[in-house]
C-alpha cells in the first residue's frame, strides 16, 4: 500500500522509513495537457501536382514513361460478386475435405464385430471365410462364380411334375395320330 501525502516537490528531503506497514512512494501530480501540445505552425505548405508540372514544361530531363500493361480480371466486377465467388470456392474446398474424410472413414477404418472377418471391404462371418477365399478377387472371376452358383442352385431345385402333363402328352399324341390318319385318308 502507498502512504498518501507525498509529492514530487518533496523530492530532495528524505524522510526516515516508518515501520507502520506503508511504503512512502511519492505520488505523481496530474499531467497538464498544455505541456503536450505544440503550438501550431504559422504557415503550412502543401505541394500539389500542379507545382511539379512546370518542371516538365521547362525541359528538364525526366526518365521516359514506360507503358504499363496490367490485366485485371476483377475490373468492372462488384464487390458482392467477388465475395460470392470467394465463398463458393471456400464451400467447394470444404466439401472436398468432408468427402475425403468420409471416404477415409468408410474405406480404411472399418472394424468388424466379434465373430466376423473383413474380406474385400465387407464383414463376413468367420464360418464363411473359407468360402470367400476360394473365390478370386478379379471381377470376371466373381461374375462367373456367381453364374455357376446360380446354375447349381437351379439344378438342385426339384421340379414338380404336374399330374396333368401325362394327360396332355397323351392328348397331343392322339391328336397327332388323328391328323396323320386324316391326311392319309
UniProtKB/Swiss-Prot annotation:
Residues 129-164 are annotated as: Required for GRIP1 interaction. Widely expressed in brain and spinal cord. Expressed in neurons during maturation and synapse formation. InterPro entries: NSG. GO terms for biological process: amyloid precursor protein metabolic process; apoptotic process; clathrin coat assembly; endosomal transport; neurotransmitter receptor cycle; neurotransmitter receptor transport, endosome to postsynaptic membrane; positive regulation of receptor recycling; postsynaptic neurotransmitter receptor cycle. GO terms for cellular component: dendrite; early endosome; early endosome membrane; endoplasmic reticulum; endoplasmic reticulum membrane; endosome; glutamatergic synapse; Golgi cisterna membrane. It comes from the Eukaryota. Residues 1-82 are cytoplasmic. GO terms for molecular function: clathrin light chain binding; ionotropic glutamate receptor binding; signaling receptor binding. Plays a role in the recycling mechanism in neurons of multiple receptors, including AMPAR, APP and L1CAM and acts at the level of early endosomes to promote sorting of receptors toward a recycling pathway. Regulates sorting and recycling of GRIA2 through interaction with GRIP1 and then contributes to the regulation of synaptic transmission and plasticity by affecting the recycling and targeting of AMPA receptors to the synapse. Is required for faithful sorting of L1CAM to axons by facilitating trafficking from somatodendritic early endosome or the recycling endosome. Belongs to the NSG family. This is Neuronal vesicle trafficking-associated protein 1. It comes from Rattus norvegicus (Rat).
